[in-house]
Amino acid sequence: MKSGVISQHSHSTLLTPNSEYMSIITKKKGTLEYLTAEGITVPHGFTTRYGGVSVGTQYSLNLAFGRGDTMENVEENLRRLGAAVGFDPEKLVMTRQIHSDIVRVVTDGDCAGFCHRDYPECDALVTNTPGVTLLVFTADCTPLLLHDPVTGAVGAAHAGWRGTALGIGVKTVEAMVKNFGCKRSNIHAAIGPNIAQCHFETDGDVPAAMVEAYGPEAERYVERRGEKYYLDLKAINALALRRAGVRNIEISDACTYCQCDRFWSHRASRGERGSQGAVICCKEVCR
């Protein structure tokens, strides 16, 4: 653990047959706060709103360009995050998210220093290039981080309900297996804060898409209240990852809507918001 970083355990769920309990941890460096998973041993984190320099509706650790914040503020926020988590912000690769099932394989040739380039559209990134750091953005959608400690490969995915129905998490695992020779059973996954079932209200098309994708078992994670439906997208993504052969899955219990003072929530803010991120850095494996 880095000097100056304070750890505090928070509630989490772990879906890991034949594995010891691990938990999501809150870490702080100064005022900057982020969450990490015990099972992922490379620098990574799910950010909160705390610890940056942005103001107004982007207060304070906004990581997204193009939402009304200044480029200087976002760059400083990324520098602060890099210093806290332990990665070089000049070696970030980011996403231009479109609620798809597109996974990009990236190397250090895709790094361009913050966001000074147009990244291709995708909703997940994978790499096995040491030093490269992956970043996806959320503000209610479900962030997924993946790490194979044997090959060193990492992945990050943004799973909205459409991406969840399309299997973005599974396709990220498959990209790691295909491109880097990962074994599914070696991969550790962490599912970060999202809008929880208590507030994720939908019409019938959303649960129908989940049942079509994952069968009747998905109905366990759907609650009907009158004419509306409430879904647990963390549990559905965990179901998908388990079926893909991932055994070690840690799940944050944080709800972005319930804790909209701590996380950005698109629904709670009616779109007036910044974005938090899920970040993971590839490190060289010691042989």
What do these predicted ranges mean?
Residues 1-19, 287:
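Short, basic, low-complexity termini and linkers enriched in Ser/Thr/Gly/Pro
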Residues 18-287:
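Active-site microenvironment for binding and transforming phosphate-containing groups
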